[in-house]
Swiss-Prot record:
The modification N6-(pyridoxal phosphate)lysine is found at residue 228. The lineage of its organism: Archaea, Methanobacteriati, Methanobacteriota, Methanomada group, Methanococci. It is an enzyme of class 2 (transferase). The keyword Signal does not apply. Keywords: Amino-acid biosynthesis, Aminotransferase, Histidine biosynthesis, Pyridoxal phosphate, Transferase. Belongs to the class-II pyridoxal-phosphate-dependent aminotransferase family. Histidinol-phosphate aminotransferase subfamily. The gene is hisC. GO terms for molecular function: histidinol-phosphate transaminase activity; pyridoxal phosphate binding. PANTHER family: HISTIDINOL-PHOSPHATE AMINOTRANSFERASE, HISTIDINOL-PHOSPHATE AMINOTRANSFERASE-RELATED. This is Histidinol-phosphate aminotransferase. Pathway: Amino-acid biosynthesis; L-histidine biosynthesis; L-histidine from 5-phospho-alpha-D-ribose 1-diphosphate: step 7/9.
Length: 371
C-alpha cells in the first residue's frame, strides 16, 4: 500500500488554493525592488492596521510563553459592543472566517447532504463543503445583469437534502450586494442554514448590513472578519454571528487555542481605535472611487459596480486575464486574475484599493499598456 492508497479519494480531486501573489514573490521572480511593487491583488487595507496595535503587541511579548485566553472573553465583549449582538451569539475563528466556515460544515454535513453555492464567488465554501462529504448544487450570479443574484437558481435547487446555502454579500469577486428582499426570500423558503458572508460589509451602505438577522432568524449565520477595513489580514481573525444553539455545537468541535495571544490583542485594540477604523473606511471609499473613475476611461475594459474595496474588470479586447496580469507583474503591479473563480470566463481580473499614490501609478501603467 502506498501513500496515495491511504489518502481519501475526495482529497485527490482538489487543486491547491492559489492565493494572491506577494510582493516578495514578485521581487524574486522579476528582479524588481520590493519598494517599487504595488500590491492590488488581495483586497487588503493599504493603510495597514491601527498604530496602537504595535504598542499593544510589544506589551504582550512577555506573555508569549502562556496559552491564550481560551474563551476570548474580552474580545467577545468588544465585538459585541461593535455589532450590537450578545456575546453568546458570537463564535470566533482563529484562521479568519475560514475556520468558522469549516467548523459549520463539520457540524452540519453528512455524506450526501447538499450545499447550494451561487457562482462566481469565494472558493473556500466549496472546498470546505466537499471535503466533509457534501454535494454542491451550483446557483448563479447573472453576468447579463451585472452579476445580480439569480434568486430562482437558488430556490430551484433547494431539496430535503439541502443543509446550507452560501450567500456572499458583497460578493467576492464581483463586488455587488444581494438585495435584502432576495435574501429574505431564501431564508424563509428553507430550514437550511443560510451563511451570509459579510467580509466586506464595512465598505457597503448601512442598510445592507444584515448582522442583526442572525438574531431574527434561527437558520442564519453571518460571517465577519478583521482582515479588511481593520487591516489585520496577517493575523487571521474572523467570527460568526448566529443563534446560541449553533454556537454551542461549534464550541464543542472548534480548536481550543486557535486564536493566538497576539491576534486577540490586535483585534481588541483595533475595535477600540474607532478613529483609525473610520478613517480607513472613508479613505477606502475615496480610493475605490479613484480606481473606478480611472479605469472607466478605458474603452477596452468593462468595470463592474462595487460595494467593496475592489473592482471586477472585464477585458474586452480578446486578451485573457493571465496574459494581461503577467504584463502588469513585469511592471511591478499585482492584481488578481480570476481564473480560479468557478463561473467566470478567462477575461476577468480583480483589482483592490491602494493608497492614492499607488492608484495613480497603477492607472499610469494601465495607460502605457492599453493605449
Amino acid at each position: 500500500m502506498t501513500i496515495d492508497d491511504i489518502i481519501r479519494p475526495i482529497v485527490k480531486e482538489f487543486k491547491a488554493y492559489v492565493p494572491g501573489k506577494s510582493k516578495e514573490e514578485i521581487a524574486r521572480n522579476y528582479g524588481i525592488s520590493i519598494e517599487k511593487i504595488i500590491k492590488l491583488g488581495s483586497n487588503e487595507n493599504p493603510w495597514g492596521c491601527s498604530p496602537k496595535i504595535k504598542e499593544a503587541l510589544l506589551l504582550e511579548l512577555s506573555k508569549l510563553h502562556q496559552y491564550p485566553e481560551p474563551l476570548n472573553s474580552e474580545l467577545l465583549g468588544e465585538i459585541s459592543s461593535f455589532i450590537g449582538v450578545p456575546c453568546e451569539n458570537i463564535i470566533i475563528g482563529g484562521d479568519g472566517a475560514d475556520e468558522v466556515i469549516d467548523n459549520i460544515m463539520r457540524i452540519l454535513i453528512d455524506e450526501g447532504d447538499e450545499v447550494i453555492i451561487p457562482i462566481p464567488t469565494f472558493t473556500q465554501y466549496a472546498i470546505s463543503a466537499k471535503i466533509h462529504g457534501a454535494k454542491i448544487k451550483w446557483a448563479k450570479f447573472d453576468k447579463e445583469k451585472d452579476f445580480k443574484l439569480d434568486v430562482e437558481s437558488v430556490l430551484n435547487n433547494i431539496t430535503e437534502k439541502t443543509k446550507a446555502i452560501f450567500l456572499c454579500t458583497p460578493n467576492n469577486p464581483t463586488g455587488n450586494v444581494i438585495s435584502n428582499e432576495d435574501i429574505k426570500k431564501i431564508i424563509e423558503s428553507t430550514d437550511a442554514l443560510i451563511m451570509i458572508d459579510h467580509a466586506y460589509i464595512e465598505y457597503s451602505k448601512k442598510e445592507y448590513d444584515l448582522t442583526q438577522w442572525a438574531l431574527k432568524y434561527d437558520n442564519v449565520l453571518v460571517l465577519r472578519t478583521f482582515s479588511k477595513v481593520f487591516g489585520l489580514a496577517g493575523q487571521r481573525i474572523g467570527y460568526g454571528v448566529t443563534n446560541k444553539k449553533i454556537v454551542d455545537y461549534m464550541m464543542r468541535i472548534k480548536p481550543i487555542f486557535s486564536l493566538t495571544r497576539a491576534s486577540q490583542v490586535s483585534a481588541i485594540t483595533a475595535l477600540k481605535d474607532k478613529e483609525f477604523f473610520n478613517g480607513c473606511k472613508i479613505n477606502g471609499i475615496r480610493s475605490i472611487t479613484q480606481l473606478h473613475d480611472g479605469l472607466k476611461k478605458f474603452k477596452q475594459l468593462k468595470v463592474y459596480p462595487t460595494e467593496t474595496n475592489y473592482l471586477l474588470v472585464e477585458i474586452k479586447n480578446g486578451m485573457n486575464s493571465k496574459e494581461f496580469c503577467e504584463i502588469l507583474l513585469k511592471k511591478g503591479v499585482i492584481v488578481r486574475d480570476c481564473y480560479s473563480f468557478e463561473g467566470l470566463e478567462p477575461y476577468y481580473f480583480r483589482v483592490s484599493i491602494g493608497t492614492f499614490e499607488e492608484n495613480e501609478r497603477f492607472l499610469e501603467i494601465m495607460s502605457e499598456i492599453i493605449e
